[in-house]
Amino acid sequence: MDLNDYRKEIDSIDDQLIALFAQRMETAEKIAEYKRANGLRVLDARREKEKMRALMDKTPEDLREYVSSLYSLIFELSRSRQSCLLGTKGDLPAKIAEAIEKTPQLFPEDAAVACQGVEGAYSEQACERLFKRPSTFFFSSFEAVFSAIEKGLCRYGVLPLENSTAGSVNAVYDLMTQHNFRIVRSVRIKVDHNLLANPGAKLENIREIYSHEQAISQCAHFLQGLPNVKVIRCENTAVAARMVAESGRDDVAALSSRACRDLYGLDSLAASVQDQGNNFTRFICIAKNLEIYPGADRTSLMMVLPHHPGSLYKVLSRFNALGVNMNKLESRPMPDRNFEFMFYFDLETSVYAPQFTQLMGELPELCEDFSYLGSYSEVI
């Protein structure tokens, strides 16, 4: 036999597999009707374990890993089909539908907005991209921004979530597990760092540089060229610029924005010192209540999964089975649980798609703890 003969044999086997798979799914549909009539849940974990064990007993040892992966996917597809036929369960899809109906058609042009830092911060630039006429209130910490939303001091809050060079803002992710909020929009801001100092200062005389840890990370290559300079972290790039201006010293500088240069009367000793030219930070806009504006095509979730093998795989398989694209997966350790994590997901799917509604009805059953953070669009 030559290669073409082997391929024809594979084609013949595939024809049989398709017919058998269709037959299996038809039987799964009958099981779904039985479960509907008898008030049974779609997922029967014990049955799946027993079935997988029986399959492994019948499978040659060198193929068990492959058969296990194959049937894990078949089980997932079967559950997805049954869930689709039985309709969504739980109250989350209904809450989302209600929010879509009650949310105004247009995103607000003006609002009270909480930001971390001081005037000139990149968060302020994000506010101005999101709102035409924001009333911006500055707070000393990320946690204070979350608290301002929870207490009703501001309707919205703007927080940095990730940077294209330095990665995730871990402090914000950790706080997300501790507060009640909803994401209503996001925006990407181009970040251009400059070395700012008081008028008359010279680069060769600089002994200390202040900035936020993310900015320091984004300018690592530039800072390596200044080995005798002490780099000091502070709360915010705008705070760093203000500290330098208020110090009156000619031997200190800040990594900050051009806006802060003009705002605080500083000179730029070096421009665009970030490692990557295309350096963007993604900010989220949070609110106390769920607001879903037209065009929402991104959804954020947090989950605590059962602490056993395959838990994350089952969630990812559910995304795959429904054709939902995942843009981001982040894990953060949970302080009160040894070696357990909170998983953060960004999904790309329209809130109007039937697979989105089905997914929101199914996911809570796969988790120990599930948080729907919101569905929104991103300003780019």
PLM region descriptions:
Residues M1-I380:
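Domain-level signature for soluble enzymes in the chorismate/prephenate branch of the shikimate pathway
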